[in-house]
Swiss-Prot record:
Disulfide bonds join C213-C230. The keyword Protein biosynthesis does not apply. One of its GO terms (molecular function) is L-glutamine transmembrane transporter activity. It holds the Pfam family Aa_trans. The gene is slc38a6. Residues 1-25 are annotated as: Disordered. Keywords: Amino-acid transport, Cell membrane, Disulfide bond, Glycoprotein, Ion transport, Membrane, Sodium, Sodium transport, Transmembrane, Transmembrane helix, Transport. It is found in: Cell membrane. GO terms for biological process: amino acid transmembrane transport; glutamine transport; sodium ion transport. It comes from the Eukaryota. This is Probable sodium-coupled neutral amino acid transporter 6.
């Protein structure tokens, strides 16, 4: 089978002989034209880039509403469930020879399953890309202006216009990266994005000792006398705790990128891909935990849902804070081409099926998707709210529901086996998280700003 394009063909299941569970070093993908694939580290960086996004800014707020120990337990559970759900998907690849999420849906639920998964991936990734571009449109001008000495230097400048900046970065940076035929090429930009996230974490740790506790109550830096505010809570249970669960539940969602990355992995075996997944999830877990912990220990109960805004309040025009703000925006920007790849693959699979790679189809679908998300980011002012409902549903399906359901439908393991019980558990968790996420969003809408 040729693997020289974005739209990988799928081997006929009847022709595939599954490998035994004790032969995890045997290549999972069908043998065909041999080209060197992506390195292990490149694949791991791509997965980490797919995992980490702007959501890292809200994890300190989640810790404030669940407690340090409660947050750590929940984060560990979510990371473990994400790794396990990917394990089930790779196990199905082992058993069937299928190498795409859409094809697993077709195997489990026939053609409606394929369409369902492809549409879910499209909605999820288009929503994520639109939200990321919307963040860039609103935050990038302020991040650039922050480096200027005075407001008079920026008055009337072109970079004050968020739409202009958004179009420029999309055409100059996102489009060339999105046009690349292989997701493995994005390993370099993904490593840069991960370094930006590390930089953010280091700054959060360092700035812990730059802001006094109790926090200043006004611009003259007079201190609040309530020293009890400087005590970390181990466990917190309140109505706001429900808001933290969805944020954490989706913090390890990378499942739409797993299959494209796996298809291009050099010497693709289940063990090798699972190792790449485990490394990515572990490093993301460490970055999440450290940044959330020190962000919380800096502001305690006063931490907001967007961590960097709190630093702007107490450390105005701090060069490190301004730099890390720009770094996070650049990391978000470099994530867009990566999550564009599975969306384009889903479009091509819906429109062209399993035909050979075509540069014309590849380019047209790329322009179509980027134009769509750009228009959504520019002209839909509440795009994050619109995709909040849909995104919570699609994320739940991709992270929990589909892996569990597909395993139960495709696998021949007894229902009482460990993996079957785990698949049922994923289904239940998916339903609970999905209902909770929708409830939180609806309550937020009812209560208003």
């Amino acid at each position: 089978m040729g693997r020289n394009g974005a739209n990988h063909s799928i081997q006929t299941v009847s022709e595939y002989e599954p490998i035994g569970e004790d032969e995890e070093r045997t290549p999972l993908l069908p043998q065909g034209v041999q080209t060197r694939g992506s390195s292990f580290m490149s694949s791991a960086f791509n997965l980490m880039n797919a995992i980490m996004g702007s959501g890292i800014l809200g994890l300190s707020y989640a810790m404030a509403n669940t407690g340090t120990v409660g947050f750590s337990i929940l984060l560990l559970m979510v990371a473990s469930l994400a790794a396990y759900s990917i394990h089930l998907l790779l196990l199905l690849c082992d058993k069937t020879g299928i190498n795409s999420y859409e094809a697993l849906g077709e195997k489990a639920l026939n053609r409606p399953g394929k369409i369902l998964v492809a549409c879910t991936i499209l909605i999820q990734n288009i929503g994520a890309m639109s939200s990321y571009l919307f963040i860039l449109k609103t935050e990038l001008p302020a991040a650039i202006i922050g480096f200027m000495r005075s407001d008079s230097e920026t008055s009337g400048k072109w970079f004050e216009n968020g739409v202009t900046l958004l179009i420029l970065v999309t055409v100059i940076i996102v489009l060339p990266l999105a046009l690349l035929p292989k997701i493995g090429f994005l390993g370099y930009t993904s490593s840069i994005a991960f370094l930006f996230m590390l930089f953010f974490t280091v700054v959060v740790v360092v700035k812990k000792w730059s802001i006094p506790c109790p926090l200043p109550i006004n611009s003259t830096l007079s201190l609040s006398l309530n020293t009890s505010e400087c005590t970390a809570q181990l466990f917190v249970i309140s109505s706001k705790s429900a808001y933290a669960v969805p944020t954490m539940a989706f913090s390890f969602l990378c499942h739409t990128a797993v299959f494209p990355i796996y298809c291009e992995l050099h010497r693709p075996t289940k063990r090798r891909m699972q190792r790449a997944t485990n490394v990515s999830i572990f490093l993301s877990f460490v970055v999440y935990l450290i940044s959330a912990l020190f962000g919380y220990l800096t502001f305690y109960s006063h931490v907001g849902s967007e961590l960097l805004l709190a630093y702007n309040t107490y450390l105005p025009r701090d060069i490190l804070v301004m730099s890390v703000r720009l770094a996070i925006l650049l990391a978000v920007l470099l994530t867009v081409p990566l999550i564009h790849f599975p969306a384009r693959k889903a479009v091509l699979m819906l429109c062209r099926g399993e035909r050979e790679f075509s540069w014309l189809s590849h380019t047209l679908s790329c322009f179509f998707i980027l134009t769509l998300v750009l228009l959504l980011a520019i002209f839909v002012p509440d795009i994050k709210n619109v995709f909040g409902v849909v995104g919570s549903t699609t994320s739940t399906c991709l992270l929990f529901v589909y892996p569990g359901m597909f395993f139960l439908r495709i696998s021949s393991e007894p229902i009482r086996s460990f993996n079957s019980v785990g698949a049922v558990f994923l289904l239940v968790i998916g339903l609970v998280v999905g209902v909770l996420s929708l409830s939180v969003i609806i309550v937020s809408w009812v209560q208003g700003p």
